[in-house]
Design a protein with these regions (language model features):
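Lectin-like carbohydrate-binding module/patch detector with strong preference for beta-trefoil
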Residues: 1-195
Length: 195
């Protein structure tokens, strides 16, 4: 989805007008009204080889993860956590699906990121689930606020890095950092040095 393709960082606001927040315990994910907190900012990573899958990284450097752990015994919703797995697997992948001006984030299980409401323990909780009742259909809809935009250079650098990975590395040329003519400016594509 194009909004995530151009975003470096986003905030997600639920139907309850609360932001998806990474808790200080560096494991839990909840909803809060304060969207200006750093913990409400999620860095966007486009999954290599995919045009429609993303990973979201918290302010604590952990990924938004669709776990297999039940939120409550007997309930269908599963916990959404912050994790830092040794291997980046599909539990970290989210597929953004546009729904008018809003977005649904779909897991590999076919569930959707859901900001829950109601009485505790549901209030402010975040799960992934399929909404079965019409009353909770909107709970899977999120407003996306772009906090940081990728620069054009970042996009071309990312594209350039991707191309470099597909090509064999070129041989390294020996160059001394002092290879210049004294008293004259030295110029390269990226740097300018003058004595």
């Amino acid at each position: 989805m194009e909004i995530f393709q151009k975003a470096k960082a986003v905030r997600l606001r639920s139907h309850h007008d609360k932001y998806l927040v990474a808790d200080e315990d560096e494991e839990s994910v909840t909803q809060e009204r304060n969207g200006s907190a750093g913990a409400a900012k999620w860095t966007v990573e486009i999954i290599p080889g995919s045009t429609n899958l993303i990973r979201l990284k918290s302010a604590y450097g952990k990924y938004l993860t669709a776990s297999n752990k039940p939120f409550l015994l007997g309930a269908t919703g599963k916990k959404v956590l912050q994790t830092n797995p040794s291997r980046l697997d599909s539990s970290l992948a989210w597929e953004p699906i546009r729904d008018s001006a809003l977005v649904k984030l779909k897991t590999r299980y076919g569930n959707f990121l859901r900001g829950n409401g109601g009485l505790p323990p549901w209030r402010n909780s975040v799960t992934h689930d399929i909404p079965h009742r019409s009353a909770t259909q909107e709970w899977v809809l999120w407003h996306v606020d772009v906090v940081e935009i990728l620069s054009a250079n970042a996009n071309s650098d990312h594209h350039h890095q991707h191309l470099q990975l597909q090509q064999p590395p070129s041989p390294l040329h020996h160059s001394d950092s002092l290879d210049f003519t004294p008293g004259s400016p030295s110029r390269s594509d990226r740097f300018f040095r003058q004595e």
